[in-house]
Amino acid sequence: MASSNLLTLALFLVLLTHANSSNDASFNVETFNKTNLILQGDATVSSEGHLLLTNVKGNEEDSMGRAFYSAPIQINDRTIDNLASFSTNFTFRINAKNIENSAYGLAFALVPVGSRPKLKGRYLGLFNTTNYDRDAHTVAVVFDTVSNRIEIDVNSIRPIATESCNFGHNNGEKAEVRITYDSPKNDLRVSLLYPSSEEKCHVSATVPLEKEVEDWVSVGFSATSGSKKETTETHNVLSWSFSSNFINFKGKKSERSNILLNKIL
């Protein structure tokens, strides 16, 4: 009888340990405030509760701002080979002084916890080199106003996937963005809609996040503006929600639990 009780307790502890070993995350920001953000560079929050990434003084040259959610997000649990899926929705407005000569754009990014701003300009405050740099541990979805396209960048400003999107035509208009990551398929998908013009843009790529970013990341935004008055633009994020969850990735969680149970039995 005692042996049976011990076995039941052992089973419970194994299942409890693995049920709680990964950390799901969820938040919804309808109005930004400085208490739930890590602000870097020129980034600030307006009195209306909007996230202002660049040009806080108005048409500021060579401006750069980054803002990340204050709590780290777990992407990978190596103890059970479990990778998180996630989805994020946000709205933004980019306003260029001269739509024929604007720079550089805005990005949603996963960066290392404690990351500091990188180079300005086309590097968007996220990278220090043009070439692939595995040590960057950064994956970004870039809304590139120079090339008028959406990019998926993995540890480099050289994109692994692009799709044209006319930011100039929609200058100053609100954009609605949804990004999803399906961990079993390593599938990263981006959808953008401008309600005012009904223009839609889509891009996707295969990104094995467990190889490209650290297990815990900071999620948020980065933007840079041009180095001359005629190339300046503002980048404002109006709302943001994010949700991540761990699923039974390729059956490995169950396999590991079974191994542990077999050892007990």
UniProtKB/Swiss-Prot annotation:
Q: Kindly state which keywords UniProt assigns to this record, in alphabetical order.
A: Disulfide bond, Glycoprotein, Lectin, Plant defense, Seed storage protein, Signal, Storage protein, Toxin
GO terms of biological process kind:
defense response
Give all cystine bridges in this chain.
165-201
Q: Which molecular function GO terms apply here?
A: carbohydrate binding; nutrient reservoir activity; toxin activity
Tell me which positions the record assigns to the signal sequence. Answer: 1-21
Q: Where does the UniProt entry place glycosylation sites? A: 33, 89, 128
| UniProt superkingdom | Eukaryota
Q: Does the keyword Membrane apply?
A: no
- State the oligomer form and interacting partners: Homodimer.
State the similarity comment: Belongs to the leguminous lectin family.
Q: What does this protein's UniProt record list under function?
A: Seed storage. This carbohydrate-binding lectin has toxic effects on an important bean bruchid pest, Z.subfasciatus. Antibiosis properties of legume lectins are proposed to be due to the lysis of epithelial cells of the intestine by binding to the carbohydrate moieties of these proteins.
Q: What is this protein called?
A: Arcelin-1
Record the organism. Answer: Phaseolus vulgaris (Kidney bean)
Its organism's taxonomic lineage begins at: Eukaryota, Viridiplantae, Streptophyta, Embryophyta, Tracheophyta
